[in-house]
Amino acid sequence: MGDPLTQQTARFEVAAFRGLCFVAAGVSFSVSIWWRRWIASPLFRAIDSHPGSYHVSSGRRKILNASFYITFTAWFIGILYIAFGGYVLPTSITTPLGRSEGYLEQLTAIIFLVCSIVFARLAWCYRGHRPTRAFLTLFAFVFLVFVGEETSWGQWVFGFETSGLMEGINVQDENNLHNLFGYAADHIFIAGTMIYGVVLPLLRFCYPFWDRLFSAIGLPVPSLGLALGFLASGLTHGWTVGVLVEQTVVLSKAELREFLVAIAFLMLALECRTGLRQP
């Protein structure tokens, strides 16, 4: 029947999703009634008058860019490894690579650390739009938290015991947050990644207002090519990969997904680094 905590969390998430749908419906209904008042508001006019960011670089409009090729190459290699790794590689390689706290998870933590360093350096050196600098600083902090989460805050590196607070609510008995309450935090991470990495770039590309809004508040948004990379990474689950290939190695799909998402965020950091250099 599965873990009771996971089942309880799943029921809660379904109820929360229904609630969000009702809220979204209410907001949409309100906008449809008072849209004239909204577009005449000073806030809307201020956002609409912002120049946006597509005029700065056409690179973010490209689909087949470096971010697309790198993220999809990583995804393709991951699928090939799952399908054929057990046939061509010895267990002395596949076992430490795929186990919990193995090489893949350690590499994911290293990539998140690089992301944090890149964003911290960008925030330190950037002297332009203040909101942009604030988001760069926030991203640097968030990715540093991701490093701690991937390493269970040093639990396996330094041999810490699982905290008493985590016992019974962490499904893997680890000192981290993303495995609490039946993977609820992990599900939030997946949903947040898909919204930020896929939905926001599409809104930005399709509607000039969203481009101006994101630019006005200083939010870095992935390119269209990277959005497809986020989509492929976020859809890497047992129920999707299992349809494509038969697994030949011991490797958690969740660990592979986190690794691919880490690569996508690294490409985002490099896109920001390139974009902020442009005049």
Annotate each predicted stretch with a short phrase.
Residues 2-11, 91-94, 168-183:
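Juxtamembrane membrane-water interface segments that cap and precede transmembrane helices
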Residues 30-33, 227-279:
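C-terminal transmembrane-bundle signature of multipass membrane proteins
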